[in-house]
Amino acid sequence: MSYLLASALLFALGVYGVLTRRTAILVFLSIELMLNAANLSLVGFARAYGLDGQVAALMVIAVAAAEVAVGLGLIVAIFRHRESTAVDDLSELRG
């Protein structure tokens, strides 16, 4: 059960990071922390109850790797266009 406690703590830290950080890269890292917390809980449940949580965790890791590539590409493109990665600046729409 310590896996679930660690997973809940990591997820809470990720939520805190998403809600308080203002740069896109730190928000992105916080989201990745939340995904890793979900992976940890999947593996913890699989260890405790004999389920196939490892397979689901590997799928989440594969999807997260693709998400990292696309997300960092978007952040770099936004930085080149606006010279800032502040989330508050991204909320302004241009027509």
From Swiss-Prot:
Its EC number is 7.1.1.-. Keywords: Cell inner membrane, Cell membrane, Membrane, NAD, Quinone, Translocase, Transmembrane, Transmembrane helix, Transport. Its main location: membrane. The chain crosses the membrane at residues 1-21, 25-45, 59-79. It is an enzyme of class 7 (translocase). GO terms for molecular function: NADH:ubiquinone reductase (non-electrogenic) activity; quinone binding. It comes from the Bacteria. The keyword Nucleotide-binding does not apply. The keyword ATP-binding does not apply. It is a multi-pass membrane protein. One of its GO terms (cellular component) is NADH dehydrogenase complex. One of its GO terms (biological process) is ATP synthesis coupled electron transport. It is found in: Cell inner membrane. NDH-1 is composed of 15 different subunits. Subunits NuoA, H, J, K, L, M, N constitute the membrane sector of the complex. PANTHER family: NADH DEHYDROGENASE SUBUNIT 4L-RELATED, NADH-UBIQUINONE OXIDOREDUCTASE SUBUNIT ND4L. NDH-1 shuttles electrons from NADH, via FMN and iron-sulfur (Fe-S) centers, to quinones in the respiratory chain. The immediate electron acceptor for the enzyme in this species is believed to be a menaquinone. Couples the redox reaction to proton translocation (for every two electrons transferred, four hydrogen ions are translocated across the cytoplasmic membrane), and thus conserves the redox energy in a proton gradient. Belongs to the complex I subunit 4L family. This is NADH-quinone oxidoreductase subunit K. It comes from Thermus thermophilus (strain ATCC BAA-163 / DSM 7039 / HB27). The lineage of its organism: Bacteria, Thermotogati, Deinococcota, Deinococci, Thermales.
